[in-house]
């Protein structure tokens, strides 16, 4: 950003004609202005300017104002100070943000001349040493992440509706809550240590891709099975909510010259992946919001259709700090099973949010874990809807940390983050839901009511199991806790890349092994055959390293008795049974979960050794 400040005895401007195809709308208040003893801030918004630049500009402008003592500050868009200008839509939003922040930090009157118009002006400069100053506003230290500074008030809210100061609450019965509070309120977090989850990720084919940007993973054939299973499961979950849901697909890049896209990006604030194409600036989506909202604005929606959801497993991008990147948890590219539910009003959104909340808690319980929750809430919602908030917390059946922020900053009034406490005793956000009162209007999404009048819906955002990779982190973290307790770690059978491995002791038993494999495969399960010329001990050890739930060893006795000898990873038991019995066990363990086919050859002798098994 470049600014030229002039302390003027008198200043007059008048808008004459459009300089842009879509200039800012003229009003009686802004089309012409007369000022005395005014600090005129001629401003060029440059490519890459953001909230941090605005904050620095505010500091510079107020520093000058404190020295020259004007009655008024006028922000005057002036493109001639720079050759590296931001797009018009982005420049306008930055100018509005500059105006807003100046108003919030000074008692002086602050005005802004209209953007996108040719204007005539007359200027009478005081002529003292500080009357004309030129400044270039930049943020040094490349790669700095810009975070919105907010005044927050923290409370502990219990299921019985009592509110406590976090410093005075008794955490003896709530150690997980204390870990979350220590981090969010007091800025304390355990230093961590060796995270076994990283080893588990690599074991199953989740690796960094060194030929891409930092924070991008590649997914081997074992990892693909896990990913596809969870993607399908996430769709099954949203279909079970009892409301109509539409599955869609779309693009992952959106033009920042579109006003709603830019406004949403500015609200997101930081960690944006941006790119230029043909002199236009695009942002890579950080969730499915952009595409779904862009689609919904073109739909004709009746009140009779509400509530309904729109769902996509969206490839999403966030420019996370390099030092914070973590396999399957903090990534620059990931997959988000993003559901948005349109509701008539806030009351309906609250009702549907309870259904979403129940499903979030139900899903984490299925893998033997529990969440500790952070409720981010606006001050208006905290004051006016306290009973509603207490009802949400009662359903948690556990105290929550509440963070109250000023109203009118974000698009949501309630943003609930669900954290696990991982094997290193650190909070890790997984699932979430939000009640959004702003994006319906921002993207001009409307529905028609009984009287034919148009309204903007209230929108619920939710990732019921979290991002796909973060759900996998939770699965592996659960296994890490098992190992920490001295148990054999495992993952649920429905997610195991290979659910059954058949090991014939000799090649002469291969025909029988193939018949057993065919029967299991026809029942819908993933099975392979270790036909390599390795020793039985090595084959069993290799299957154990892959955490295969059921290892079937076939020898002469099994062939003669038409049985199978099964080693069960979860219990470390070894049992002789018929193939149908194993199929019944698999059906029970994978009931209500998706069936995804094998992503590699059935015979191990046909497979190269992947990097993660080398």
Swiss-Prot record:
Reactions accelerated catalytically: tRNA(Thr) + L-threonine + ATP = L-threonyl-tRNA(Thr) + AMP + diphosphate + H(+)
Residues covered by region (Catalytic): 195-492, 196-492
Enzyme class: ligase
A GO biological process held by the record: threonyl-tRNA aminoacylation
Cofactor(s) needed: Zn(2+)
Subcellular location: Cytoplasm
Cofactor annotation comment: Binds 1 zinc ion per subunit.
Recorded GO CC terms: cytoplasm
Quaternary organization: Homodimer.
Recorded domain comment: The N-terminal domain is an archaea-specific tRNA-editing domain that hydrolyzes incorrectly charged L-seryl-tRNA(Thr). Catalysis of tRNA editing is performed by the charged tRNA itself.
UniProt xrefs under PANTHER family: THREONINE--TRNA LIGASE, CHLOROPLASTIC_MITOCHONDRIAL 2, THREONINE-TRNA LIGASE
Name of protein: Threonine--tRNA ligase
């Amino acid at each position: 950003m470049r600014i030229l400040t002039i302390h003027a005895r008198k200043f007059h401007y008048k808008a004459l004609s459009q300089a842009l195809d879509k200039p800012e709308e003229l009003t009686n208040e802004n089309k012409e202005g007369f000022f005395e003893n005014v600090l005129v801030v001629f401003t060029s918004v440059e490519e890459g300017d953001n909230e941090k630049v605005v904050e620095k500009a505010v500091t510079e402008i107020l520093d000058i104002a404190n020295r020259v003592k004007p009655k008024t500050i006028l922000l005057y868009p002036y493109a001639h100070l720079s050759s590296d200008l931001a797009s018009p839509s982005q420049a306008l939003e930055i100018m509005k943000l500059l105006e807003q922040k100046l108003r919030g930090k000074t008692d002086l009157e602050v005005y802004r001349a209209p953007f996108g118009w040719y204007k005539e002006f007359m200027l009478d400069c005081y002529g003292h040493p500080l009357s004309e100053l030129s400044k270039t506003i930049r943020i040094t230290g490349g790669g700095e992440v810009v975070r919105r500074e907010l005044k927050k008030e923290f409370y502990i809210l219990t299921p019985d509706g009592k509110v406590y100061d976090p410093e005075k609450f008794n955490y003896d019965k709530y150690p997980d809550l204390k870990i979350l509070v220590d981090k969010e309120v007091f800025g304390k977090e355990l230093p961590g240590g060796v995270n076994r989850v990283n080893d588990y990720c690599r074991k199953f084919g989740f690796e960094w891709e060194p030929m891409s940007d930092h924070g991008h993973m590649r997914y081997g054939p074992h990892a693909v099975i896990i990913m596809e299973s969870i993607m399908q499961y996430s769709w099954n979950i949203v279909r079970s909510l009892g409301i109509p849901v539409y599955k869609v697909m779309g693009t992952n890049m959106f033009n920042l010259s579109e006003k709603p896209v830019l406004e949403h990006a500015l609200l997101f604030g930081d960690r944006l992946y941006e790119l230029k194409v043909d002199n236009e600036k695009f942002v890579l989506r950080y969730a499915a919001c952009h595409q779904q909202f862009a689609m919904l604005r073109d739909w004709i929606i009746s009140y009779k259709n509400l509530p309904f959801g729109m769902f996509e497993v969206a490839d999403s991008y966030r420019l996370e700090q390099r030092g914070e990147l973590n396999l399957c948890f903090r990534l620059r590219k990931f997959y988000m099973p993003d559901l948005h539910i349109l509701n008539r009003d806030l009351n309906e959104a609250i009702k549907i949010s309870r259904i979403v909340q129940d499903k979030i808690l139900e899903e984490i319980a299925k893998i033997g874990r529990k969440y500790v929750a952070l409720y981010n809430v606006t001050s208006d919602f905290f004051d006016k809807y306290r009973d509603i908030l207490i009802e949400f917390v009662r359903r948690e059946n556990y105290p929550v940390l509440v963070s109250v922020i000023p109203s009118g900053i974000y698009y949501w009034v309630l943003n609930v983050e669900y954290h696990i406490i991982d094997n290193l005793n650190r909070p890790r956000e997984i699932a979430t839901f939000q009640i959004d009162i702003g994006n319906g209007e921002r993207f001009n999404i409307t529905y028609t009511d009984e009287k034919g009048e148009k309204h903007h819906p209230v929108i619920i955002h939710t990732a019921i199991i979290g991002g796909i990779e973060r759900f996998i982190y939770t699965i592996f973290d659960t296994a890490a806790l098992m190992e920490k307790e001295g148990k054999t770690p495992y993952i649920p059978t429905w997610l195991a890349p290979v659910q059954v491995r058949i090991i014939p002791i000799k090649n002469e038993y291969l025909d029988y092994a193939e018949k057993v494999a065919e029967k299991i495969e026809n029942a819908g399960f993933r099975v392979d055959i270790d036909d390599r010329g390795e020793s039985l001990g090595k084959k069993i050890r290799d299957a154990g390293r892959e955490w295969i739930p059921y290892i079937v060893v076939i020898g002469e006795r099994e062939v003669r008795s038409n049985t199978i000898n099964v080693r069960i990873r979860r219990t470390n038991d070894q049992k002789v049974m018929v193939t149908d019995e194993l199929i019944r066990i698999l059906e029970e363990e994978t009931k209500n979960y998706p069936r995804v086919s094998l992503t590699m050859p059935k015979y191990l002798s046909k497979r190269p050794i992947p990097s993660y098994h080398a």
